[in-house]
C-alpha cells in the first residue's frame, strides 16, 4: 500500500487526503475553477461482496467499469476532482479497516494518475453532509493553492442519497 501519511490531515472531526499537488492539466485560468464533487460509497465505489456495508478493507470495487476513465477525463479537461464522504463509523472501527479501505480506493485513483482531494467527515456535526463544513474546508484548501474563484455553473456534485424511496437518506441532494 502506498504511504499517504504525508498527504493526510487529521482532525478530531474530519480527515483531508490531499493528492492535488498540481492544478488540472489543462487548467489555464486558476480564477475560474470547475469542481467535480463526488460521494464515495454508492457513487464511485460499492462493496464487492454485495453487502450494504463492507466486511473488510478489501470489500470494494468501482461502481462502474469506466469510473477511472471518467475521473481521469474530467481531471485532464481541467476539472478539480473532490470526494466528500461521511464515515461516522471510522473512529469506532477497532482495526481501522474503514480508513485502510478508503486508502486502497484512493491509491487506485492515484495509480490512474488522477489528482484529487478527499474530505472525510468522521462525526455527526457540521462537517457531515448535508451540512457544508466539508465544502467550506474544500474551498479554503483550494484558495490556499491559489484557486480564488469557483465556477458554480460548470461545477457539480454527484451522490446516491437523493431521498428517493430506495435511498437511505437525502443528504447528498441537500449537500448539492
Q: What residue ranges belong to the model's regions?
A:
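Short helix-terminating capping/connector loops at secondary-structure junctions
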Residues: 29-31, 74-78, 113-115, 146-153
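Short coil/turn segments at secondary-structure boundaries
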Residues: 48-51, 95, 168-171
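Short histidine/acidic/glycine/proline-rich micro-motifs that form metal-
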Residues: 87-93, 122-126, 162-165
